[in-house]
């Protein structure tokens, strides 16, 4: 099955503490989760690793969020949108369901 959400897609969070925030997908995990830039920030207590020259402390980083809790953001409508697939010139492409516009 083709991935509806891909890396570098502009998405909007539908539920949770970051509801309504927009960000760019940095990584799509095989477990059905995605990592979005600036969304779902958590504080990790990092141990120092002198061999690598890493300092210890509290580091803020992005945690994975389930793909069902985000939707692709349609710039034309300014809203969250659904994705469909169709064939154009022998290639499978993604499109916005609301206005039929091809994604990228």
UniProtKB/Swiss-Prot annotation:
Pfam families: KOW (PF00467), ribosomal_L24 (PF17136). Part of the 50S ribosomal subunit. Gene3D superfamilies: 2.30.30.30. One of two assembly initiator proteins, it binds directly to the 5'-end of the 23S rRNA, where it nucleates assembly of the 50S subunit. GO terms for biological process: translation. The keyword Manganese does not apply. Belongs to the universal ribosomal protein uL24 family. This is Large ribosomal subunit protein uL24. Keywords: Ribonucleoprotein, Ribosomal protein, RNA-binding, rRNA-binding. SUPFAM superfamilies: Translation proteins SH3-like domain. NCBIfam families: rplX_bact (TIGR01079). GO terms for molecular function: rRNA binding; structural constituent of ribosome. HAMAP family: Ribosomal_uL24_B. The gene is rplX. It comes from Aliivibrio fischeri (strain ATCC 700601 / ES114) (Vibrio fischeri). InterPro entries: KOW, Rib_uL2_dom2, Ribosomal_uL24, Ribosomal_uL24_CS, Ribosomal_uL24_KOW, Translation_prot_SH3-like_sf. GO terms for cellular component: ribonucleoprotein complex; ribosome. It comes from the Bacteria.
């Amino acid at each position: 099955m083709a991935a509806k959400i891909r890396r570098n897609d502009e998405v909007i969070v539908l539920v949770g503490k970051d509801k309504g925030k927009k960000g760019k997908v940095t990584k799509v995990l095989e477990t059905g989760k995605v990592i979005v830039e600036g969304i779902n920030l958590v504080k990790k207590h990092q141990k120092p690793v002198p061999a690598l020259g890493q300092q210890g402390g509290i580091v803020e980083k992005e945690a994975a969020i389930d793909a069902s809790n985000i939707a692709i953001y349609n710039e034309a409508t300014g809203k969250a949108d659904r994705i469909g697939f169709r064939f154009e010139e022998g290639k499978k492409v993604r499109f916005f369901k609301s206005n039929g516009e091809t994604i990228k």
